[in-house]
């Protein structure tokens, strides 16, 4: 099942199975059709049903409007899964380089392969690929657009500052 939803970062496409959310993407510059074709192509054997009522709970949980667990169903190579799991351990408000992420997963010479796995992350925002930058500190190569990446990082930094100030 899939459905379009509003998010703090613009329209997003959510994809879910009976076991959990397996895709989240933001509208590409080419529009909704291109976004849907790009994201839904990952499940070429699946019978896809447009059902935004079924994906709405995932959207609410992903963007903090509703509490509760957010079950993820990730499909990838063992290496990709390892990278995506490492992404979920990067604290909100923080960024790491591809090189540091490669070191973190025990593959210090695999920064390019890590970058490739980050780029194929099917669940944007929830698996926070936006928290990875070049070793030079430059924020580049975000599938959903560099402006959106800057907004995601700025929002997280602001939330982190607010929460830190409250302590």
Question: Where do the language-model regions lie?
Answer:
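Basic nucleic-acid-binding alpha-helical/helix-turn surface characteristic of O6-alkylguanine DNA
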Residues: 1-109, 155-167
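Helix-turn-helix DNA-binding helix
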Residues: 111-114
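Major-groove DNA-recognition helix of helix-turn-helix-type DNA-binding domains
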Residues: 120-122, 126
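Short cysteine clusters
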Residues: 129
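…primarily DNA-binding HTH/wHTH and HhH modules…
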Residues: 135-167
């Amino acid at each position: 099942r899939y459905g379009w939803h509003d998010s703090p970062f613009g329209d997003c496409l959510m994809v879910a199975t009976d076991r959990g959310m397996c895709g989240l993407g933001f509208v590409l510059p080419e529009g909704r059709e291109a976004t849907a074709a790009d994201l839904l192509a990952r499940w070429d054997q699946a019978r896809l049903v447009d059902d935004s009522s079924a994906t709405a709970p995932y959207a609410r949980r992903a963007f903090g409007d509703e509490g509760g667990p957010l079950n993820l169903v990730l499909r990838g190579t063992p290496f990709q899964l390892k990278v995506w799991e490492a992404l979920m351990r990067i604290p909100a408000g923080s960024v790491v380089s591809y090189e540091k992420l490669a070191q973190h997963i025990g593959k210090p010479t695999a920064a390019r392969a890590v970058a490739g796995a980050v780029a194929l992350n099917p669940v944007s925002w929830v698996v926070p690929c936006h928290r990875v930058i070049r070793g030079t500190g430059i924020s580049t190569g975000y599938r959903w657009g560099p402006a959106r990446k800057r907004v995601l990082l700025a929002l997280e930094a602001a939330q982190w500052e607010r929460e830190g100030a409250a302590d």
